[in-house]
From Swiss-Prot:
Keywords: Amino-acid biosynthesis, Cytoplasm, Glutamine amidotransferase, Histidine biosynthesis, Hydrolase, Lyase. It comes from Buchnera aphidicola subsp. Schizaphis graminum (strain Sg). GO terms for biological process: L-histidine biosynthetic process. PANTHER family: IMIDAZOLE GLYCEROL PHOSPHATE SYNTHASE SUBUNIT HISH (PTHR42701:SF1). GO terms for molecular function: glutaminase activity; imidazoleglycerol-phosphate synthase activity; lyase activity. Disulfide bonds: none annotated. The keyword Ribosomal protein does not apply. Pathway: Amino-acid biosynthesis; L-histidine biosynthesis; L-histidine from 5-phospho-alpha-D-ribose 1-diphosphate: step 5/9. NCBIfam families: IMP_synth_hisH. The active site is at 77 (nucleophile), 179, 181. This is Imidazole glycerol phosphate synthase subunit HisH. It catalyses: 5-[(5-phospho-1-deoxy-D-ribulos-1-ylimino)methylamino]-1-(5-phospho-beta-D-ribosyl)imidazole-4-carboxamide + L-glutamine = D-erythro-1-(imidazol-4-yl)glycerol 3-phosphate + 5-amino-1-(5-phospho-beta-D-ribosyl)imidazole-4-carboxamide + L-glutamate + H(+); L-glutamine + H2O = L-glutamate + NH4(+). Residues 2-197 form the Glutamine amidotransferase type-1 domain. Pfam families: GATase.
Amino acid sequence: MDIAILNTGCANLTSIQVAIKKLGYDSIVTSDPSIVLKSKKIFLPGVGTALAAMEQLHKKNLINTLKKLTQPILGICLGMQIFSQFSEECKGVKTIGIFDNCFTHLLKSSNLPLPHMGWNHIVFNNLHPLFKNIDKKERFYFVHSYIIPLNKYTLAKTKYGVSFSSVMQKNNFFGVQFHPEKSGDAGAQLLKNFLEI
């Protein structure tokens, strides 16, 4: 299987590549649009700011490439957030716009520290293939200060002061707010499920 990990210059690519390798799959780290378009599965990891990620995607001519994709792609953390239409981060950033009418906001919870960092539960419908063989008691590892509120594309939600989208899907575009590559066996199972979709 051809698996591409998009190199946006805004992510720790080694951890996701190692996690995929442990599942028995090889992957390639690339920012070449022609390789991305030919890949069977694509990962868009992201750490940092929406502005930096969008600048890198624009510089590498990847924004239109991403919009053309028909094969499954998984955005991780910031990777999911930039699938929204707009981010409040950095005084406002127009993002890719896959999840239409969805906006990324600062996580506002008066009595809890930011970033939301550590292990937390996700509430999901286990009939979806992405959650196959994942127990509802499992927890996943989060590190973020911005959220996409609950919306029509939400597959799973998490509460940290307020409830927010922790897993989303629109057609072939999937997103997770947590880091599956740092979430132990449950995270590995979710990656496996995505690769088998």
